[in-house]
Amino acid sequence: MDFLPLFHSLQGRLALVVGGGEVALRKARLLADAGARLRVVAPQIHIELRHLVEQGGGELLERDYQDGDQPGCALIIAATDDEPLNAEVSRAANARGIPVNVVDAPALCSVIFPAIVDRSPLVVAVSSGGDAPVLARLIRAKLETWIPSTYGQLAGLASRFRHRVKELLPDLQQRRVFWENLFQGEIAERVLAGRPAEAERLLEEHLAGGLAHIATGEVYLVGAGPGDPDLLTFRALRLMQQADVVLYDRLVAPSILELCRRDAERLYVGKRRAEHAVPQDRINRLLVELASQGKRVLRLKGGDPFIFGRGGEEIDELAAHGIPFQVVPGITAASGCAAYAGIPLTHRDHAQSVRFVTGHLKDGTTDLPWQDLVAPGQTLVFYMGLVGLPVICEQLVAHGRSAQTPAALIQQGTTAQQRVFTGTLENLPQLVAEHEVHAPTLVIVGEVVQLRDKLAWFEGAREDA
């Protein structure tokens, strides 16, 4: 290990930055974030750097660097393109025992800057010892996706209660177990879900009750998106990996299901047209029952749970029984599949609005507001419209839409098995029969479909017509 990782307190202390360009600005911002007083020395100083120093009450010295600029400083940064000057700054700082960093010159540094993931007060630093800073930044980018932005609030909550917990649990091992359970339990989840006040109230109750464990379950209603696992949100992935039991439907791709916690119980509750593996009211009751047992329940739905996903019915049942829940939106099929097919749902020249329509209503009919659906300047996206497609096309034409209106079928959109077929309202049902198109398939109707010829970018199964 060439460098010992340490965290340096600069609060209220003087830090010297030699240089006035963009690199100096980046370093100065870090120093300012750490509470340092800035002294910037350079013949010319970047306007943003000038504002940063002035706002923080620092010193601007618009002249050449002088050796007398160093005394009294807690840290020195050399950020110029003048190598002899950088070397001079480094030598003088080392002679005085002042930590010094020379940008892009590890051999001249007594300290180096790591790549930083800032969730203050939680901070993660990644360093390559100056050998491969780009690699360190790439690792930091991965960490940024893995560490929720609310971890800082969680650390702050722990800080506020640290002394009280120490009084209640004087034994070090007991405290360690307490904090491990807290950071992996319901209180932490409230913070991560954006409910810090509720988390603090629960912790107060927990401490007032003598630290007795209260097992309270919760339901995570999570949108799995249209199929491509890369389209999952960070929060969706985090909840998928901590749930005790998973209830999933048939639109959840196997590759997405594999991202759930390995030892979680999995319950298939999928539905097909006129065929319910588990009736919806039973699903609602099951969510309540499992959460009442203290389990963390993941209700994983394809697309977005609030767009033709019956998510509203499920959380209505949870709310009626006082079961905590959170909802994580997903990319709905219309947005995801259209994007992967190269079909913009709105376009200044073709469509000024888009309408999402269910092709399968509660009573099994396609009794839709046809007159509204044939209005000009809009794109129609039909979910679950494959079985009723002949009626849909017939009614749109009967109510005034041209039979030559462009239309598209997108089967298993966003996945490697994606197939896209384009035609018109007149021949779309025929395309379904010719190419043996099956569910899940999205139907798009509108002038925007014709843009696919030049905007298609995703290959999929390459069986397009």
Curated annotation (Swiss-Prot):
A GO molecular-function annotation:
uroporphyrin-III C-methyltransferase activity
Instruction: Spell out the Pfam families in the cross-references.
Output: CysG_dimeriser, NAD_binding_7, Sirohm_synth_M, TP_methylase
From the UniProt record, give the pathway where this protein acts: Cofactor biosynthesis; adenosylcobalamin biosynthesis; precorrin-2 from uroporphyrinogen III: step 1/1; Cofactor biosynthesis; adenosylcobalamin biosynthesis; sirohydrochlorin from precorrin-2: step 1/1; Porphyrin-containing compound metabolism; siroheme biosynthesis; precorrin-2 from uroporphyrinogen III: step 1/1; Porphyrin-containing compound metabolism; siroheme biosynthesis; siroheme from sirohydrochlorin: step 1/1
| Modified residue annotations for Phosphoserine | S128
The yes or no answer to whether the keyword Cytoplasm is present is no
Q: Which reaction does it catalyse?
A: uroporphyrinogen III + 2 S-adenosyl-L-methionine = precorrin-2 + 2 S-adenosyl-L-homocysteine + H(+); precorrin-2 + NAD(+) = sirohydrochlorin + NADH + 2 H(+); siroheme + 2 H(+) = sirohydrochlorin + Fe(2+)
- Region feature Uroporphyrinogen-III C-methyltransferase, mapped onto this chain: 217-465
Q: Could you tell me which cysteines form disulfide bridges? A: none
> Active-site positions, per UniProt?
D249, K271
Q: Where does S-adenosyl-L-methionine bind?
A: P226, G302, G303, D304, I307, T332, A333, M384, G413
Keywords in alphabetical order, please: Cobalamin biosynthesis, Lyase, Methyltransferase, Multifunctional enzyme, NAD, Oxidoreductase, Phosphoprotein, Porphyrin biosynthesis, S-adenosyl-L-methionine, Transferase
Could you say which residues bind NAD(+) here? Answer: E22, V23, P43, Q44
Q: What are the BP-aspect GO terms? A: cobalamin biosynthetic process; methylation; siroheme biosynthetic process
Indicate yes or no for the key word Protein transport: no
Q: Segment Precorrin-2 dehydrogenase /sirohydrochlorin ferrochelatase: which positions?
A: 1-203
Stored InterPro entries:
4pyrrol_Mease (IPR000878), 4pyrrol_Methylase_sf (IPR035996), 4pyrrole_Mease_sub1 (IPR014777), 4pyrrole_Mease_sub2 (IPR014776), CobA/CysG_C (IPR006366), NAD(P)-bd_dom_sf (IPR036291), Siro_Cobalamin_biosynth (IPR050161), Sirohaem_synt_dimer_dom_sf (IPR037115)
EC numbers = 2.1.1.107, 1.3.1.76, 4.99.1.4
The job of this chain, per UniProt, is described as: Then it catalyzes the NAD-dependent ring dehydrogenation of precorrin-2 to yield sirohydrochlorin. Finally, it catalyzes the ferrochelation of sirohydrochlorin to yield siroheme.
**PANTHER family in the cross-refs:** SIROHEME SYNTHASE, SIROHEME SYNTHASE-RELATED
| Annotated HAMAP family | Siroheme_synth
Regarding protein family, the annotation reads: In the N-terminal section; belongs to the precorrin-2 dehydrogenase / sirohydrochlorin ferrochelatase family.
Q: What is this protein called?
A: Siroheme synthase
Q: Which organism is it from?
A: Pseudomonas aeruginosa (strain ATCC 15692 / DSM 22644 / CIP 104116 / JCM 14847 / LMG 12228 / 1C / PRS 101 / PAO1)
- What gene, per UniProt, encodes this protein? cysG
